[in-house]
Amino acid sequence: VRDVTYNVGWNHNEITQLDAGLQDWVWTGDKVSRGNNTKIQVNKVGQPINSFYVFQQVYDENGKPIEGLYVDRNGNGTIDDDDRYCYKNPAPDVIMGLTTKFIYKNWDFSAAFHASIGNYVYYDFLNEKAVLADLSKDNIFRNTTAEAVNLGFWGKTTKATNTSDYFVRNASYLKCSPVC
């Protein structure tokens, strides 16, 4: 073994205050594909930066999301924007790196690994393709994924499915850079 190095970093971020005169939260991030100018990320006091601001999806007994059905988080009997909540964020909790270089006689081997753990993304492609009724608009068939077909969302509800926490996915990874 010739050389081994590593690093580990922890990340905790929380908004403690916003500019004076503003409410305790502001919209941030890009609009989602199928959302009529809908944004799903906020900066809110007490939450991590760019938290996903979504509805809590309800699932059937088999774990399949039920189209347009969300948890009434404030208990007022109506699903509205007051039922949205901050769920996960795109910033990783842990970032790690490892580099190695091994030498034996006339042979050498080196590799570099890096990892990002605890970061989340909004799966906008699936959100855009999730409503099966949209697959053949204007006599043009569009591509989709098997997961979108299995969801079985037909767009028969007035509740927007694009603001569901179902589309927020874990994006943690471990990557090995080219090995030499």
Model-derived segments and their meaning:
Residues T28-V42, G46-I49, Y87-G97, K101, ...:
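C-terminal extracellular loops and terminal segments
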Residues D3-T5, I95-T99, P178-C180:
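Membrane-embedded beta-strand positions in outer-membrane beta-barrel channels/transporters
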Residues V1-P90:
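Conserved small-residue
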Residues D83, A111-I117:
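Active-site proximal loops enriched in glycine and acidic residues that flank catalytic Cys/His/Asp
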Residues V1-V4, K101-A111:
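Secondary-structure transition into beta-strands, especially the periplasmic turns and strand N-termini
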Residues V8-E14, Y104-N106, A115-N119, P178:
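Transmembrane beta-strands of outer-membrane beta-barrel pores
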Residues N62-K64, S116-C180:
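Extracytoplasmic gating/loop element in the C-terminal half of outer-membrane beta-barrel translocons
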